[in-house]
């Protein structure tokens, strides 16, 4: 057990100038003996400009605050006593004494040196604004840099040593982005309304992951984003005119190493290194990312006397999904022998040469089912998460029933989605069932 020591100093001058300093001295049992503690500081400053005397002349201004912060945090969750030697039992057993057999021990992975917890350097600047007794806005921009990330070293060391290689602690990723939220609310006698919205953008870039050698620059993960798609570039489907009378590809077309003989309706891939072959050296990192870069949402509210109506919307953008559900997108592939109507209607045939998906076959076809952008679709969506109609009983009536409040409501959830995928929920693309639509009737009572 390790004690953590923390100090916090807060400064507030006339509710105008604010500052906080936090200092943490934290230990971890997963670090080497004699080197188990690390220092993690953080500082934040703010200026509430609306409290300045010279700002009082702006009658529309309710609140204005400028702030900035910087801090360092640590994370040892991925550490696993990596500095210790490992010995593995097993293999053949032998009898040395009596009739009991004994297994031998062999050195496992090499111990790691320079074991460090992951560190994240976080910087943030923001503005908070209030106007006209009803409008509010908050804007934030951030930049984070994660360092000392634990990673495999097998990519940079030879495998001929016969033992598991030590981990390295020099992985690095940067994250940056921003968020903006705005809202307006107003009450006019018996009628009131409100609208709120927010949008955030976040992107990451891999600085170092200890990659081994790749013969082509487009094969390196470094410099790309976590979740960025890796695979072949599909350029369409082969047509009958791409083959000669004997069924062979015309001269100049790259030969597939995944399938001995291609046919019309098979996927046409780009030969990136122009060596006349389609193989693993033609895989590359593409623009598609399987992690949304933009999240957004907005809510609307109306009230009139005892009636209320509210709606919450949520969506994502800059997002791609990889369609790998065999029963829908890869018929007769592997152990799944079903064929979806969607695939039948969108597969290649001689009468549908511009189809989206390759020809249907009962035979194995490793060429068509390689990881490629053919199976990627735009995953952006906007969903109505909640729609609720409510009625609050009059006070005179609730008092007679000895209740302080009584509210009746009808609520619907996941009522509709606007997206680019015909038959699947982009939020649950590889699940058997989409997000469920549900309806609730309820009552809230306070006594």
Mark where each language-model region is.
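Conserved small-residue
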Residues: 171, 187-290
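Glycine-rich, aromatic-lined ligand/substrate-binding cores of catalytic
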Residues: 289-323
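C-terminal extracellular loops and terminal segments
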Residues: 167-174, 213-229, 285-301, 329-345, ...
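Conserved SET/PR-domain catalytic core that frames the SAM/AdoMet-binding pocket
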Residues: 206, 281-282, 292-299, 303-306, ...
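Extracytoplasmic gating/loop element in the C-terminal half of outer-membrane beta-barrel translocons
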Residues: 28, 264, 316-408, 412
